[in-house]
Amino acid sequence: MDVKGHAAIVTGAASGLGAATARALAAKGAKVSLLDLNAEDAGALADDIGGVAIGCDVTSAESAEEAVKAARDRHGPARILVSCAGIAPPKRIVGRDGPQPLETFSNVIRVNLIGTFNLLRLAAADMLSQDPLETGERGVIINTASVAAFDGQIGQSAYAASKGGVAAMTLPAAREMAKSGVRVLAIAPG
């Protein structure tokens, strides 16, 4: 898919992989909405690349819905979603202070897995609302898994589980969306 002129949403866009992705999409001519909990840092990058920064908590249905609407209002419905929002706090199952707090594990799952699904469902709805391009495509969704999903290390139980969930979610999502012209795939950096 040629991204030039198409609306793109990147989560976790204030830093790291998300920032690099937003930059690359803008360089190819995409209209980029940079979603991040840290709207200030996303704003600095958005100014630099000609995009728009939108504060977004990917774990919140309401926040994500508002962010996708703001992106749609600015650039039109998304044809591209790249989900890079994620956290990776290293934490042993049982450390010096005792068992890992369940909330630590739950929070990683909320951000990395549920947050990815939250944006996937909203972007997919935007893509399906549009007519296909001449190529038959309606859009592309790229989820960020990690090599940790397949080869996690000590202290990565929550992170590996969350990224394994992203990898496992992507195949059925790809199968479901393919007939409608939306490609869904996952990358696994590391």
Model-predicted regions and their roles:
Residues 39-40, 55-67, 102:
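The beta1-alpha1 cofactor-binding region of Rossmann-like NAD(H)/NADP(H)-dependent oxidoreductases
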Residues 120, 162, 170:
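Active-site helix of classical SDR
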Residues 87, 98-118, 142, 166:
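Catalytic Tyr-X3-Lys loop
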